[in-house]
Amino acid sequence: MALATGPGKQTQLREVEGVPLQAAIVDNWGQIQSFEAKPDDLLICTYPKSGTTWIQEIVDMIEQNGDVEKCQRALIQHRHPFIEWARPPQPSGVEKAQAMPSPRILRTHLPTRLLPPSFWENNCKFLYVARNVKDCMVSYYHFQRMNQVLPDPGTWEEYFETFINGKVAWGSWFEHVKGWWEVKGRYQILFLFYEDIKKDPKCEIRKVAQFMGKHLDETVLDKIVQETSFEKMKDNPMINRSTVPKSIMDQSISPFMRKGTVGDWKNHFTVAQSHRLDELYRKKMEGVSIDFCLEL
């Protein structure tokens, strides 16, 4: 099924088991599902606009023991393949991952039910970052405005409806977060919150390092905190997507690294929208004991 888009862009999403995805991903679905994970793979898992780039840089800095030069070896989007990524004729995320030596650090936005089965079968490590739904929606809205390969989001009012109905790329925020939360006790999953990393980055970075089996001294931890601050990353051309062509990401519309704050939703939501989403959250997340922070 193709989902309609706004008038500005001709991009359409198609669905896999009810989850909207970019057409190229759907066309490559067989290769994605048959992907062979390895037991020593670490998979970074996020819903879009939940701190993917941030946690990726943190993980890379930990892996490189805080060596900034080693983290400059390639653009961030090329260091750790995004497994479902597809844009022919370029190599797919699966092909890039297959060409990597072990141990591999990989990325995905897929919900649990669409993840290639080999990740579960090989008991891989998963690092999940969740962000509160209101800030996530705002960030995704601005990202879709500037991203030329995703559907036009329309007005904020229109996007609000699209998002709460799960008709955005990678589907429902509620299903995504709930799905990963519910399996975290059965697999090697470190479940983190964007807001906690913002509040106490050193504490959360230490958790990630321990999960990765890395012991870092305080000096290295402090360096990683400094190098992965929003301000540092926004000015880092290896991270800020400034090399991505305007035909793919038009940063004159909205920067890729926009604000990186907690509570920006208050600048976008009406009181009615906020109440409506609160009610929807209670209904959709019933039985899930997550208490998201909405402001710092």
From Swiss-Prot:
EC number in record: 2.8.2.1
UniProt GO BP: sulfation
Expression by tissue: Found in gastrointestinal tract tissues, liver and kidney.
Residue numbers binding substrate: 107-109
Predominant place of localization: cytoplasm
Cellular component terms (Gene Ontology): cytoplasm; lysosome; mitochondrion
UniProt key word Calcium: no
Keywords noted in UniProt: Cytoplasm, Lysosome, Mitochondrion, Phosphoprotein, Transferase
Catalytic EC class: transferase
Phosphoserine found at: 139, 254
Active-site residues annotated for this sequence: 109 (proton acceptor)
GO MF annotation terms: aryl sulfotransferase activity; cholesterol sulfotransferase activity
Residues binding 3'-phosphoadenylyl sulfate: 49-54, 131, 139, 194, 228-233, 256-260
Subcellular location: Cytoplasm; Lysosome; Mitochondrion
Reactions that this protein is recorded to catalyse: a phenol + 3'-phosphoadenylyl sulfate = an aryl sulfate + adenosine 3',5'-bisphosphate + H(+); cholesterol + 3'-phosphoadenylyl sulfate = cholesterol sulfate + adenosine 3',5'-bisphosphate + H(+)
Family according to the record: Belongs to the sulfotransferase 1 family.
PANTHER family tied to this protein: SULFOTRANSFERASE SULT
Function text: Sulfotransferase that utilizes 3'-phospho-5'-adenylyl sulfate (PAPS) to catalyze the sulfate conjugation of phenolic compounds. Does not transfer sulfate to steroids, dopamine, acetaminophen, or alpha-naphthol. Except in mitochondria, where it can add sulfate to cholesterol producing cholesterol sulfate, which alters mitochondrial membrane organization, and impacts protein complex mobility increasing state-III respiration, thereby modulating mitochondrial respiration.
Protein name: Sulfotransferase 1C2
Native organism: Oryctolagus cuniculus (Rabbit)
